[in-house]
Regions:
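A short, flexible loop at the N-terminus of ABC-type nucleotide-binding domains that lies
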Residues: 1-6, 10-22, 29
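Walker A (P-loop) phosphate-binding loop of ABC-type ATPase nucleotide-binding domains
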Residues: 38-42
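Helix-to-loop junction immediately C-terminal to a conserved catalytic motif
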Residues: 51
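Conserved ABC transporter NBD signature motif
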Residues: 59-72
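ABC-family P-loop ATPase nucleotide-binding domains
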Residues: 81-136
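Catalytic Walker B motif of ABC-type/P-loop ATPase nucleotide-binding domains
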Residues: 149-153
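Helix N-cap at the start of a conserved alpha-helix in ABC-type nucleotide-binding domains
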Residues: 160-162
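H-loop (His-switch) and adjacent beta-strand-loop-beta switch element
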Residues: 197-211
């Protein structure tokens, strides 16, 4: 069974212009998929639809065979593009909150990742840089034993020195029966961890997709170079 099935999905905002138009995709278990495209092409909208934060105009979304609802929310771990925690909270309070709220949260894993990145659990969020706040949020999201991880621009605010560690941590510790969707514009940084990729254009049109390694071998180019060619960057 595929972890994610999206069929004929359409979503419009103002003036009834579709952000996603008859969009379909299937993602099997154990895959890390890069959803790659320019700003405004519908990447974040798709992530919010899968997470249940938005409702589609038409189409179907199934996560582990279930329609979006309470069952899917329990098995999806979602990292939004922007930090949403209260700035007055301590990191250790957030860790305890996640432990209480999510039955699949691994507190030991979260504390280990915080330690490895030199982040003090007793620090308050308001004392941290934007990049460190994003590291904390990513650690909490990836410390759940979910079936589907939705990561919206997970390393956009993270310093280059920490990106490799964070990405390697994602690969080495997530459930092999789960899948991860990563949206990003930092293709050269993330392509090393991607199994599959989707180049998404405006209106949710898929311009190119497939196995990342096969695409590199067949074209003799990195995904980053292919992306620049496809979108004429």
């Amino acid at each position: 069974m595929n972890v994610l099935e999206v069929k004929n999905l359409t979503k419009s905002y103002k003036k009834h212009i579709p952000v996603l138009n008859d969009f379909s995709i299937s993602i099997p278990a154990g895959r890390i998929v890069g959803l790659l495209g320019p700003n405004g092409c519908g990447k974040s909208t798709l992530i919010k639809l899968i997470s249940g934060l938005l409702q589609p105009d038409s189409g179907e979304i199934l996560v582990d065979g279930n329609e979006i609802g309470e069952k899917t929310k329990a098995i999806i771990s979602y990292l939004p593009e922007r930090t949403y925690f209260n700035s007055w909270m301590k990191i250790e309070e957030l860790v305890n909150y996640f432990e209480e709220f999510y039955a699949d949260f691994d507190k030991t894993r979260a504390l280990t990742l915080l330690h490895d990145l030199g982040i003090e659990p007793k620090a308050k969020l308001k004392s941290l840089s934007k990049g460190t706040k994003e590291k904390v949020q990513l650690i909490l999201v990836m410390s759940r034993k979910a079936k589907l991880y939705l990561l919206d621009e997970p390393i956009a605010g993270v310093d280059p020195a920490a990106r490799e560690y964070i990405l390697s941590s994602i690969v080495s510790t997530y459930n092999p029966e789960a899948s991860i969707i990563i949206t990003t514009h930092l293709i050269s940084d993330v392509e090393q961890v991607l199994d599959d990729f989707v180049f998404l254009s405006f209106g949710g049109e898929i311009l190119m997709s497939g196995n990342a390694e096969e695409a590199r071998n067949e074209n003799g180019k990195s995904l980053d170079m292919l992306f620049r060619e496809v979108f004429r960057c």
